[in-house]
Every structure is written in C-alpha cells, then in structure tokens.
C-alpha cells in the first residue's frame, strides 16, 4: 500500500516540476502567460498583490481631485476635473477586473484594503 502512495506522490511531484519548468520556459521565451494558465502560487499571489495595489492607488488617487470639483472656478474646469476623476475610476475598475481573472474577487481586495492587510 505504501509503495502505491510513494509512486503517486512521486508522480505528483514530477508533474509539479514539469508544470513549473513549462512556466519558466514560457517566461524565458517571452511567451504571453494567460490568467488561466498554470503558474506557481507565489507568482499568482504576487501578481494579484501588485495589480491590487495599482487598482487601489487609482481609486484612492481620484479622491483629492474629486474634492476640487465643487471649487473649480468655471464649468470648463469642472468638466476637466470630472473627466480626470472618471478616468482614474475606470483605470481602477479595469485593474480590479484583471485581478479577478487571476482568481480573487473585488470584494476580497477592497476588504483587505479596508482592514489594512493591503496597501
């Protein structure tokens, strides 16, 4: 029985090594890696963290400009500020969507930000 388990564990380890080598080969050859492709867990987590940080900075970055909308001296200036705020918000939403394709939810990312687990 243990011999069967040993072979099974060995096959799983070999498969894992093959997957990792295939991943590294793709990186070396500069082949595009899609979100559903296999990648090491640490790589996926780091990628999600980086994308989430960028998304958070886009969303948080629109807030100071938003405060100036009511203080803008002309309608033309208000329109410019509104466009900038909308642009920042859109960038944040695109980035949250990119993180979602990697297997996390927008709610998880925002909750982590609010709880101080992510910056």
PLM regions and their residue ranges:
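Non-heme di-metal
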Residues: 2-119
């Amino acid at each position: 029985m243990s011999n069967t388990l040993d072979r099974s564990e060995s096959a799983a380890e070999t498969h894992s090594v093959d997957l990792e080598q295939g991943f590294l080969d793709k990186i070396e050859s500069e082949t595009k890696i899609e979100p559903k492709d296999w990648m090491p867990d640490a790589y996926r987590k780091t990628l999600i963290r980086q994308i989430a940080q960028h998304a958070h900075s886009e969303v948080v970055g629109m807030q100071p400009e938003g405060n100036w909308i009511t203080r803008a001296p002309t309608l033309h200036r208000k329109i410019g500020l509104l466009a900038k705020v909308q642009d920042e918000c859109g960038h944040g939403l695109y980035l949250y969507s990119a993180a979602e394709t990697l297997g996390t939810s927008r709610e998880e990312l925002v909750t982590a930000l609010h709880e101080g687990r992510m910056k």
